[in-house]
Design a protein with these regions (language model features):
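A surface-exposed, glycine/aromatic-enriched loop/edge motif typical of exported proteins
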Residues: 1-23, 111-153, 209
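Residues embedded in well-ordered regular secondary structure
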Residues: 1-82, 119-122, 164-168, 185-187
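Outer-membrane beta-barrel channels and translocator barrels
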Residues: 52, 63-64, 98-102, 187-189, ...
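Small-side-chain secondary-structure face that scaffolds active or pore-lining regions
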Residues: 80-92, 109, 115-119, 175-177, ...
Length: 257
């Protein structure tokens, strides 16, 4: 904090364009905070220690003619920013049936994901905050305004990005995908092989963003009817494909055709 204040003084922040009472008062207010021991490390405020969790259950069985496999998996991935995370639940069911020279395979997979963005804002906001600023007020509450450089021709109000965590806001994305793959293999002879595959997938998703009127984004909006917003976007996609292949392999002495 002391180094930051000294750098501002040496750069002429409080003397550029001539000394004034406002500039001197502003400098004294920063000096008092430094002498009081304020030395906030802003870079760790929005960060969290993230531990990823994975859980899976697999069940397989069958005989030579019919085989099956069931799978359920859950993956929880917290983000580096506080209160950000992504949860993915996956389930799949696979069948394989062999009848003489024909092999049938079918696989169905379901994916459901929920992602929450952090209400703590972007990390770059915290890199611009000076260590002599107090994030909390006298009663321990998170302050909305941190600083005022209006006296030296700067911003009239520096907002605290932590303030947006004191109320309910939302930035959440949900996506659901179903995929099916059906495959047929036919071997009329040992040398001849035909394969056909059909795949189909459909995904739907939406994103909800809600920011109430007290959000710092609307601090400069004077019309109260324009403060706060809610946005919802939706997406849907369907994809399919067909693959047909044939192959013939024949060994003639030491050569393959």
């Amino acid at each position: 904090a002391r180094e930051t204040r000294d750098a501002e003084l040496k750069s002429g922040l409080y003397t550029y364009g001539g000394e004034t009472v406002e500039k001197w008062q502003l400098y004294q207010s920063k000096l008092r905070e430094v002498l009081a021991g304020v030395n906030t490390y802003w870079l760790d405020k929005p960060l969290q220690t993230a531990f990823q969790q994975r859980h899976t259950v697999t069940l397989e069985g069958g005989d030579e003619a019919l085989r099956y496999r069931m799978y359920v998996g859950y993956n929880s991935s917290p983000g580096v920013m506080k209160d950000s995370k992504r949860d993915v639940l996956t389930g799949s069911l696979d069948f394989q049936y062999r009848l003489k020279k024909v092999l049938l395979k079918n696989s169905i997979t379901l994916d459901n994901s929920v992602a929450n963005e952090s209400p703590w804002g972007s990390f770059s906001e915290y890199t611009r905050l000076n260590p002599y600023l107090r994030p909390y007020g006298e009663n321990g509450e998170i302050q909305k305004r941190l600083d005022n450089f209006e006296g030296v021709g700067g911003e009239s109000s520096y907002l605290n990005p932590m303030y947006n965590t004191t109320f309910n806001s939302k930035d959440q994305s949900k996506n659901f995908t179903v995929r099916e793959l059906f495959k047929v293999e036919y071997n009329p002879t040992n040398e001849l092989r035909f394969e056909g595959a059909f795949n189909l997938s459909k995904s739907v998703g939406h994103r909800d963003i809600f920011r109430p009127a007290q959000h710092t984004l609307f601090d400069n909006v004077t019309d109260p009817t324009l403060r706060g917003d809610y946005r919802r976007s939706q997406s849907e996609a369907v994809n399919w494909g067909i693959d047909l292949t044939g192959s013939w392999n024949k060994q003639l002495e030491d050569h393959y055709l």
